[in-house]
């Protein structure tokens, strides 16, 4: 996706630190990447270095260095603009969400110097197999909190107030 995993070196930014980023972080670290996490959640920012991130902070914060690539999981267009600002020349930005609010006022200078922005629309079964194999080697163990469908409101409140690590799943019985 970003080209960094294939090289086995570089500085990767993860914007949004939910389920997907939690699984990508240890894989990227295992492959030799230096990972920088951007999240609005204080608790997630505190957890990221414990999982191997070099640095963690808010999306508007300046990391200690420019990034070679970044993946935006957050569904907010303004976060993509912030990610572009943090890229090195010829850096690649991957928009990984299936939905995002509009990206407003994108200044051309953020794309200048051969920066690249792409989306991820299709993932093949082989892509998933390869990632799961790599994730297992990196010791990734997804964290899942299961709620019965009848407790959906409780799950949403918990997600908003506490944002537990990993995924919340509603079980339909």
Predicted stretch roles:
Residues 87-89:
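Helix-to-beta-strand junctions that scaffold the AdoMet/dcAdoMet cofactor pocket
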Residues 30, 125-173:
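C-terminal hydrophobic helical "lid"/dimerization subdomain
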Residues 1-60:
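Mid-domain Rossmann-like dinucleotide-binding core that forms the NAD(H)/NADP(H) cofactor-binding site
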Residues 92-94, 105-145:
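Rossmann-fold dehydrogenase core element
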Residues 13-14, 72, 95:
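Hydrophobic Val/Ile/Leu positions in short beta-strands of Rossmann-like dinucleotide-binding domains
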Residues 41-43, 77, 100:
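Helix N-cap at the beta1-alpha1 junction of Rossmann-like dinucleotide-binding domains, i.e.
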Residues 62-70:
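A short acidic, Gly/Pro-enriched loop at the edge of an enzyme's catalytic core
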